[in-house]
Amino acid sequence: MLMVISPAKTLDYETPPATQRFTQPQYLDHSQELIQQLRELSPAQISELMHVSDKIGGLNAARFGSWTPAFTPENAKQALLAFKGDVYTGLDAQSFSEANFDYAQKHLRMLSGLYGLLRPLDLMQPYRLEMGTKLANARGKDLYAFWGTRISEWLNEALADQGDDVLLNLASNEYFSAVKRTALNARIINTEFKDQKNGQYKIISFYAKKARGLMSRFVIQEKINDPALLKQFDVQGYRYSAEQSKPDNLVFLRDHAPE
């Protein structure tokens, strides 16, 4: 089973990494093409393109300017440890053992607007470029057109390497839309995590993002390769709902979030 998750806007390049091992991103020639185009934009144009503040626009203009295809532990960090959003809080990769990193490297991928597809130990230089960014480019009107079927093809390779055709989608719609299903040789399993609010179970973004990370961690720590075993996920109060689930859409409910 191969999992895909979204990246995060928040990054952590201060905390020393939990492992010294690293790999090189596999698709940097594509990233470099985007970087060259982004370098032509002023900080103000970047702010407008990304709908962010002048401060964040300036920060990312500087990041694009200093980006280099020579990735080292001095100028980059393993992707799984560099991302710091809600999904990654649930994943808590900083506490992984080397065996956990081994399993994650084979069974987990991160979708990325700049890097396309990342393995956990791939070095990553800091950036912000969300997949939904409407950056017109030589390949089309946006990043979905830029990546085309490439991400699906790379996922097919990763699926073959790890031994089956099951893809567990733990990514957001924005990012999973970069996966062209017609080009994907996989059985896709989707998940929903719902919390009780005012007597109803609803998807609450903050909790759902963290739950995707918790599920990723659960699969990695338990080395789960049978989709049926995903129903055993019971971390932090979640439980499988047979009533609300379908064979390829697993729903988990929770009555109370931990204090």
From Swiss-Prot:
The protein's matches in HAMAP family, at most eight in alphabetical order, are given as:
UPF0246 (MF_00652)
Q: What is this protein called?
A: UPF0246 protein Pfl01_0961
Q: Which family does it belong to?
A: Belongs to the UPF0246 family.
UniProt cross-references to PANTHER family, sorted A to Z: PEROXIDE STRESS RESISTANCE PROTEIN YAAA (PTHR30283:SF4), PEROXIDE STRESS RESPONSE PROTEIN YAAA (PTHR30283)
Kindly state a single biological-process term from the GO annotations of this entry. Answer: response to hydroperoxide
- Which GO CC annotations does the UniProt entry carry? cytosol
Q: Which InterPro entries does this UniProt record tie to the protein? A: YaaA (IPR005583)
What species does this protein belong to?
Answer: Pseudomonas fluorescens (strain Pf0-1)
Coiled coil ranges (UniProt) are none
